[in-house]
Amino acid sequence: MPARNHTKWKQVPGQLEVGEYVSSKIYSDENIFKKEMNTIFRNVWIPVCHESELPGAGDFRTTTIAGESILVVREEGNTIHAIKNTFERRPRGNMGPEIGFQDSPKFYHSDIKFGGFVWVTLNENPPTMDEWVDGSFNCMKESLNAEPLDVFHYHKAIIPCNYKLWHDTNSEFYHDYLHFHNRVTGFNDSYFARENKCFNNGHVNVGSFEVQYDQYEGFESREELSFPYLPTNHWEMIDMFPGINFNLRGSALRVDVMTPLSPDKVMIEFR
């Protein structure tokens, strides 16, 4: 069969009209990327770090949200502030006894929630954190708040892809079929019985799942290692819009935060 040209493709019945499909330009177009930064990322709450990463007065971390440089610092009174970063080039450190951020041209709304994570938004009139998460943390909130948490590992990677592609890998499970080890040992009835529960503002909670560690070759049950109030060997996961993942499994919590750098580049911070 000869290849179809544009005219022949236009004659194929059942074609979608413009507006009936999502263009692949959403992964590469610079103007779409800029619009996403302004209309999405400037209006959402982002967990920029954990309070344990700012243990003392003057300790700070820098980050960016929607291309805007942010400095998060703990002051003498133990309060944590998020301000516009106009002077600090280090990614983290201590500002010394003269903290001197009071003259910052911009303070951002911030809150410490859900296990001590420092959330920041550029939105000048934001919803409260509870309004923003809309109950999506109910599955793990009690476990995260039971005892003080501490970041014991940090990893950063820059991935050459659009941020939406990365978030998709945390949101779907069809790629599990490509993993031989998972095909043989990981699938059972409860794996497919999970329910994806959707919340306002684009968040999704993947239903609880009991991980059968003792079924993996070389592994054993982890019943003695578990977060408070979390059933033994259980796993909970929250995919938060537009690119945040809270993954609670047994005795460890992993949090992934995306920072889009360009249409084809995204930074992932793993804690």
Briefly describe each language-model feature range.
Residues 78-112:
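Long, hydrophobic, well-ordered secondary-structure blocks that form the structural core
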Residues 11, 15, 102, 212-215:
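Residue-identity detector for glutamine
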Residues 13, 18, 92-95, 99, ...:
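Feature targets compositionally biased, intrinsically disordered low-complexity regions
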Residues 42-54, 91-95, 237-242:
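Short Pro/Gly-enriched beta-strand edge/turn motifs at strand-loop
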Residues 73-79, 108-271:
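C-terminal catalytic domain of Rieske-type non-heme iron oxygenases
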Residues 1-86, 110-111:
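N-terminal pre-ligand scaffold of iron-sulfur
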Residues 6, 11, 16, 20, ...:
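Generic preference for well-ordered secondary structure
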Residues 54-56, 65, 101-105, 150, ...:
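Short solvent-exposed loop/turn micro-motifs enriched in small/polar/acidic residues
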